[in-house]
């Protein structure tokens, strides 16, 4: 048996294409497993706790539950529309989930893995409240980037413990926060160092997840697992504390399995206690730390079975730009895609087939149109419709004796390619395999010329059509996990029931194939539809209708305090273990300065060396990823990328900007 889970969507906002990189491949994987004869339980649910939900609810004048209800129903609707079929889709604010979370936390306490500790926490004197997680913003203590309370999302990506953030400010009122002491509870993560190193050496899954985790496990610290909130799972014996959301959210995999097994008639304990199943987590790359470090340590401490594999998708870009909801670089699943009337199968195919699962996916409406029209329609759809329509018109039913052995061998090869691809989590390779078979089918049909044979040799025409029908049957079966809605329609034309079909049925030859009039499998993606969607996106990129935030006015004296100069980059090199940071040695006239800048994703060291830049020279020194920075280079932003400010003409380094 296999248990397949998906990272829980956060019930705090709408579904976008970035979400689908987890859910569509997982659904495709589960469908292929079942068609291979595997017994599978497939679960997911809404993540309903945590400070972002509480903050958002406060800002909208809603209770956390009211906000969660809205987005929980939204995700159910989206998954249904895209034919993502979980055995059970739950929510973490349910009683059954609270029960399982409390049971596991109590077990960790009883076994001595949880202890209390007085810590310094950000406190807002104006709001008169402690500021957990997203209630506080400030500076990352490790790299100096802007950070939220529990995560350095703009810099090094580290998880931040309560009280670590520097220069904290209240997210609600903007006031400067102070630190006050309070008792919280910690999980002894450091006791699991040896276990985690051994576990990660054996864990299966995608290399992007495993490599990240193996680097992080070397510097473990105990983990604060309580928060000052009213919304969440109450921590045992502490009426004013709840369990941290990253403790209770993954426990949803267990509580949702319990509910799924109630409905399916299986025993959840065999999966999570006895370890009689493979547990496979599909997640986004941004939550690898939680799933490969925190989660297995908790499970080990509470005597639960461990995940067998962690499958992490690459990130998502939109029209080549870094995904950002705030900047408009986003495609919303419902309002952009579904409401345009496009088939859910097209989006499923694009998500799976655009690139390798571990690589970054770029969502482009132009590329989307080309892939659908040139691959799905012109290759797969063309073959299926031509063959099925010809067979129906000229035969009605076809005796299948004499199917070409070469055709059967091609079908078997395709099945093996798909199965091999699934073992490597390469869903693109699986979909490429059936597209290659469709290309072969088009050539075979064209070379056989049954429309000519039927005039002179009806038996030869029948054999040719039988071979093409076998290919059509195989393609319907192989493509079904990726494009279920369309393949169900095509299956009706050959009387094929896909409900209990097996991959091996693709090369089983029936005595007779009875045909009905086939539907056109796919509708062309029209230029007008794409142009309309592109205009919507361009408008969003420009932020039309949104006013730029106005900063507080300053005096000329304030401006004159800034020492802004022209500098020349003498040397540039990337900061180790950082994707964004680059270390620069800059000549600013009277000295050479070392400055760290977050432009490594937009400029190479070679592009920067010799370049004139604008430098803020009297900025207080700071450390980024342990590297000292004494100043700042100035840049604008265009399409989500940094654009350096440079003088129009050649200017000597050290020249002041005034």
Curated annotation (Swiss-Prot):
**Name by which UniProt lists this protein:** Methionine--tRNA ligase
**Species whose genome carries this gene:** Archaeoglobus fulgidus (strain ATCC 49558 / DSM 4304 / JCM 9628 / NBRC 100126 / VC-16)
By sequence similarity, the record places it as follows:
Belongs to the class-I aminoacyl-tRNA synthetase family. MetG type 1 subfamily.
The protein's gene is named: metG
One GO cellular component term of this record is:
aminoacyl-tRNA synthetase multienzyme complex
Q: Which residues form the tRNA-binding domain?
A: 558-658
Question: What job does this protein perform?
Answer: Is required not only for elongation of protein synthesis but also for the initiation of all mRNA translation through initiator tRNA(fMet) aminoacylation.
Q: Which residues bind Zn(2+)?
A: 140, 143, 152, 156
Sorted alphabetically, which InterPro entries does this protein's record hold? Anticodon_Met, Met-tRNA-synth_bsu_C, Met-tRNA_ligase_1, Met-tRNA_synth, Methionyl/Leucyl_tRNA_Synth, MetRS_core, MetRS_Zn, NA-bd_OB-fold
Binding-site residues for ATP, renumbered to this chain: 325
Query: What is the annotated signal peptide range for this record?
Result: none
Cofactor info, note text: Binds 1 zinc ion per subunit.
Q: Name one GO molecular function term.
A: tRNA binding
Listed A to Z, the keywords are:
Aminoacyl-tRNA synthetase, ATP-binding, Cytoplasm, Ligase, Metal-binding, Nucleotide-binding, Protein biosynthesis, RNA-binding, tRNA-binding, Zinc
Q: What class of enzyme is it?
A: ligase
Which positions does the motif 'KMSKS' region occupy?
Answer: 322-326
Give the location of motif 'HIGH' region in residue numbers. 9-19
């Amino acid at each position: 048996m296999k248990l397949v889970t998906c990272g829980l969507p956060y019930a705090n906002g709408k579904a976008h294409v970035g979400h689908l990189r987890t859910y569509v491949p997982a659904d495709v994987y589960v469908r292929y497993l079942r068609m291979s004869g595997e017994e599978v339980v497939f679960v997911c649910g809404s993540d309903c706790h945590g400070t972002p939900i509480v903050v958002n609810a406060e800002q909208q004048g809603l209770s956390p539950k009211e906000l969660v209800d809205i987005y929980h129903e939204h995700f159910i609707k989206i998954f249904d529309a895209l034919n993502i079929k979980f055995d059970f889709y739950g929510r973490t604010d349910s009683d059954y989930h609270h029960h399982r979370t409390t049971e596991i936390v109590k077990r960790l306490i009883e076994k001595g893995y949880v202890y209390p500790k007085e810590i310094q926490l950000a406190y807002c004197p104006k709001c008169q409240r402690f500021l957990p997680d997203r209630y506080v913003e400030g500076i990352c203590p490790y790299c100096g980037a802007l950070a939220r309370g529990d995560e350095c999302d703009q810099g090094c990506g580290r998880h931040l413990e309560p009280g670590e953030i520097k220069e904290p400010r209240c997210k609600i009122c903007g006031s400067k926060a102070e630190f006050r002491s309070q008792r919280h509870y910690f999980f002894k993560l450091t006791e699991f160092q040896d276990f985690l190193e051994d576990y990660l050496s054996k864990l299966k899954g995608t290399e992007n997840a495993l490599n990240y985790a193996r680097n992080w496990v070397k510097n473990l610290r105990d983990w604060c697992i309580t928060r000052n909130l009213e919304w969440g799972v109450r921590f045992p014996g502490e009426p004013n504390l709840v369990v941290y959301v990253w403790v209770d959210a993954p426990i949803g995999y267990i509580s949702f399995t319990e509910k799924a097994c109630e409905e399916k008639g299986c025993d959840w304990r065999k999966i999570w206690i006895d370890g009689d199943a493979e547990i496979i987590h599909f997640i986004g790359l941004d939550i690898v730390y939680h799933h490969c470090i925190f989660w297995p340590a908790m499970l080990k401490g509470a005597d639960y079975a461990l995940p067998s594999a962690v499958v992490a998708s690459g990130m998502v870009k939109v029209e080549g730009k870094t995904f950002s909801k705030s900047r408009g670089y986003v495609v919303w699943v419902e309002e952009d895609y579904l409401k345009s009337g496009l088939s859910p199968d097209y989006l499923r195919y694009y998500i799976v087939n655009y690139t390798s699962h571990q690589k970054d996916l770029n969502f482009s409406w132009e590329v989307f149109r080309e892939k659908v029209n040139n691959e799905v329609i012109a290759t797969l759809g063309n073959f299926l419709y031509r063959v099925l329509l010809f067979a129906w018109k000229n035969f009605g039913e076809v005796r299948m004796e004499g199917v070409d052995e070469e055709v059967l061998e091609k079908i078997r090869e395709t099945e093996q390619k798909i199965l091999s691809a699934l073992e490597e989590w390469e869903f693109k390779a699986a979909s490429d395999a059936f597209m290659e078979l469709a290309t072969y089918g088009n050539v075979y049909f064209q070379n056989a010329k049954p429309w000519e044979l039927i005039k002179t040799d009806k038996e030869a025409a029948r054999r040719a059509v039988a071979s093409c029908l076998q290919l059509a049957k195989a393609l319907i079966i192989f493509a079904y996990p990726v494009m279920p809605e369309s393949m169900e329609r095509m299956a009706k034309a050959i009387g094929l029931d896909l409900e209990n079909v097996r991959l091996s049925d693709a090369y089983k030859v029936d005595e007779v194939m009875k045909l009905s009039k086939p539907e056109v499998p796919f509708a062309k993606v029209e230029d007008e539809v794409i142009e309309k969607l592109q205009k919507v996106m361009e408008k969003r990129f420009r932020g039309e209708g949104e006013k730029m935030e106005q900063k507080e006015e300053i005096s000329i004296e304030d401006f004159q305090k800034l020492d802004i100069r022209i500098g020349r980059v003498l040397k540039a090199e990337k900061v180790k273990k950082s994707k964004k940071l680059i270390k620069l040695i800059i000549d600013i006239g009277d000295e050479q300065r070392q400055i760290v800048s977050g432009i490594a994703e937009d400029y190479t060291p070679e592009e920067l060396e010799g370049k004139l830049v604008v430098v803020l020279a009297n900025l207080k020194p700071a450390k980024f990823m342990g590297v000292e920075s004494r100043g700042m280079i100035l840049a604008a932003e265009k399409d989500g990328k940094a654009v350096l400010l440079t003088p129009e003409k050649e200017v000597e380094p050290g020249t002041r900007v005034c």
